[in-house]
From Swiss-Prot:
Domain YjeF N-terminal: 71-277
Annotated (6S)-NADPHX binding sites: 122-126, 189-195, 218
GO cellular component, one term: mitochondrion
Family: Belongs to the NnrE/AIBP family.
GO molecular function: metal ion binding; NAD(P)HX epimerase activity; nucleotide binding
NCBIfam families from the UniProt entry: yjeF_nterm (TIGR00197)
EC number(s) on file: 5.1.99.6
Protein name, entry field: NAD(P)H-hydrate epimerase
Organism of origin: Plasmodium vivax (strain Salvador I)
């Protein structure tokens, strides 16, 4: 009986040792394979940034440039009962993509202090949302809001900024702008008509005289939305434009760095108006045009 028990114990120990040895050999093989793969990885040599460095160039570069009237028609339809978007939803989507694009192009170590000029309309609302997201991303953000809106939506956006400790000021002079690394122009969007009036004409002049890098939201403020020879004499001279929904005719020949943000046009609208929308890569909410 004792011999049989000893034999069983010996056989069981031998089996366990075989299992341990097999596991060790598999682990060693995995380690060698992993080291070989790591040695073949090339270091990323792109510009230093605190945002993801995935490609945002579209493989389908055909894009529809919207007239002012068509942009307004589509915008109204997006917020109709039939489609179902709200102004708040569109602002959040637009503002997030604006912040993500800025984060991609303007690294936190060089452009930490950001001043955002927000206008009285929805373009300004997009700027208020972008300010909050940039604060999330680590930027030191200030909002200049010359004509504060009293609508509940805008007051809620301002209240959020208070809770994020984002300063909101009435104006900013040329001397004030010297304190910032980047200026964002969210004064006027596609609904703007005519010439900029006070205080916005002075603000545009101050921005252009600052020699700071400037990013415009949707169109450089003061631009004639339909383009052509009737372009306004006074408009923001930005180095990058972030179009929303689809680019407008006024920036067809922009000629500088140009992104499309706000990935919110449903298939039904694309088909109804025969729109050409660039292909967004993966889960990106923006694409470089």
């Amino acid at each position: 009986m004792r011999k049989e028990l000893l034999l069983r114990t010996t056989n069981h120990s031998a089996f366990q040792n075989s299992v341990y040895l097999l596991g060790f050999l598999r682990f060693a093989k995995f380690q060698l394979s992993s080291r070989a793969n790591i040695s073949n990885v090339r270091p990323f040599k792109g510009r230093r940034t605190n945002c993801a460095a995935t490609s945002v160039h579209s493989n389908r570069m055909e894009v529809t440039y919207l007239s002012q009237s068509l942009a307004q028609t589509i915008d109204n339809e997006l917020m109709s009962d039939d489609v179902g978007y709200t102004t708040e939803q569109l602002m959040e989507l637009a503002g997030l993509s604006i912040a993500q694009i800025i984060c991609r192009e303007y690294s936190l170590d060089r452009f930490k202090k950001v001043l955002i000029f927000c206008g009285p309309g929805n373009n300004g609302g997009d700027g208020l949302v972008a300010a909050r997201h940039l604060k999330h991303f680590g930027y030191d953000v200030t909002v200049a809001y010359p004509k504060e809106k009293t609508k509940v939506l805008f007051q809620r956006l301002l209240k959020l900024l208070q809770h994020y400790h984002v300063p909101v000021v009435k104006s900013a002079t040329g001397e004030d702008l010297k304190l910032y690394d980047l200026v964002v122009d969210a004064l006027f969007g596609f609904s703007f008509t005519g010439e900029p009036r006070s205080p916005f004409d002075e603000i545009i002049h101050t921005i252009n005289q600052s020699n700071k890098p400037v990013v415009s939201v949707d169109v450089p403020s003061g631009t004639n939305i339909d383009g052509g020879s009737a372009a306004n004499a006074l408009s923001v001279n930005s180095e990058m434009n972030i179009s929303l929904m689809l680019p407008k005719e006024g920036v067809r020949h922009y000629g500088k760095k140009h992104y499309l943000g706000g990935r919110f046009i449903p298939n039904s609208i694309v088909e109804k108006y025969n729109l050409k929308v660039p292909q967004f890569a993966g889960d990106n909410s923006y694409v470089q045009l």
